[in-house]
Regions:
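Surface beta-loop-beta hairpin patches that serve as ligand-binding interfaces in beta-rich domains
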Residues: 103-131
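Short flexible/disordered coil segments
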Residues: 57-74, 91-96
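Intrinsic disorder/low-complexity signal
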Residues: 74-75, 84, 130
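Residue-identity detector for threonine
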Residues: 9, 27-30, 35, 40, ...
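Extracellular beta-strand/beta-solenoid scaffold signature
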Residues: 1-10, 32-41, 64-74
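Right-handed parallel beta-helix
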Residues: 1, 14-29, 45-60, 79-90, ...
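Active-site proximal loops enriched in glycine and acidic residues that flank catalytic Cys/His/Asp
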Residues: 4-6, 36, 42, 76, ...
């Protein structure tokens, strides 16, 4: 999972201009709940979350609320972000106490297969992946 941001404020702060792009995120949250494949906190002006592929989010059997997870989770105060063209098998997104200015476009299973296929490490860096 990827977590970006800090705090619970809708006010502009040092978090911002982040790029979460073309990641392949899977098989996560096996020992936790209240999470997302991509999870954000606080206002992050100029942040773009795009062209990621996320699947296999599965809270552990002990989780108090097994439905409290999302592929993309904009939590407390998340504001001024663009979330677009992210592939996941279902449209399961969480928006909790968000601030203004978030733009959601074209996220879910209808996103191009090309985006899903191109996500993750580029060919020249794939040797870094644990086998």
């Amino acid at each position: 999972a990827l977590s970006v941001g800090w705090g619970w404020t809708r006010s502009a702060n040092v978090s911002g201009q982040n790029r979460v792009h073309a990641n392949r995120i899977h098989t996560i949250a096996t020992r936790m709940a209240d999470t997302g494949g991509i999870y954000t906190l606080s206002a992050q002006p100029g942040t773009i979350v795009s062209e990621n592929a996320i699947w296999g989010v599965a809270p552990g059997p002990w989780a108090h609320d097994k439905s409290h997870w999302s592929y993309i989770y904009l939590d407390e105060g998340s504001a001024y972000m663009v979330v677009r063209d992210n592939w996941c098998p279902d449209e399961k997104f969480q928006k909790n106490a968000n601030g203004p200015g978030n733009l959601w476009e074209n996220n879910g299973p209808g996103v191009s297969d090309t985006i899903r296929e191109r996500s993750g490490l580029q060919e020249k860096y794939r040797y870094l992946r644990a086998e």
